[in-house]
Amino acid sequence: MAGKRTIIVGGGGFARELLSWAADCADAGTLAPVAGVIDDNADVLADYPGVASVIGSVADYRPEPGDALLLAIGNPETKRRLVEQLSARGAGFAKLVHPTAVLARTARIEDGAVLCPLSLVSAHGHVGRCVTVNALSSVGHDAKVGAFSTLSAHVDLTGFVQLGEGVMVGTGAKVVPGVKVGDGAVIGAGATVYRNVPAGATVYSAPAKLLKAR
């Protein structure tokens, strides 16, 4: 859904990134201009004058004809809750594909998805509803990312990987070919996942250790 005006949901750091990338998309003619941000904290952008206006709260927002929403939310459960809440009022969701993102002709991208700069969705990759694919992350051939999931920056999902709904993948994580990750799982930053991950599980790699202090 392209809409006549784009409204960003959430006013945190990711929103400030999305404002820039949405402007790139508007310049390319693939997204309506951003009218503002809705956030329950009216002062969320007070320290960033000139970035955008908070035009109302999520609680008070009522869709107007031609509105299309973009989610500036990383937490999958928060995304799901907001989508359910806003959809019940008749809201529709925009799809943001940055001009520098690379999509195979056979890739499938659902409404509400956000594909950030230099992201990749390869042959027959499937990015579900309201999924975030952050900068420099890749979805390999025949891989599937379930609705409301978030791929942080520099994530590598290889061929035939299947992520369930509401999965959170930390920055720099890698998932090897054919692995299945259940709904609501969390993959920690920098992890390399070789085996299937059950629904609701959290997996991570050992953090860096101090070997020598100066």
Give the label of every model feature segment.
Residues 25-47:
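NAD(P)-binding Rossmann-fold cofactor-contacting core
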Residues 42-102:
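Phosphate-bearing ligand-interacting subdomains
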Residues 3-22:
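Glycine-rich adenosine-cofactor-binding loop
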Residues 19-21, 50, 81-85, 127, ...:
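Short amphipathic alpha-helical segments
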Residues 96-211:
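Structural signal for interior beta-strand "rungs" in well-ordered beta-sheet cores
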Residues 14, 74-77, 209:
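Short glycine-rich anion-binding loops that position phosphate/pyrophosphate groups of nucleotides
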Residues 22-27, 86-88:
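Short, solvent-exposed amphipathic alpha-helical segments in soluble enzyme
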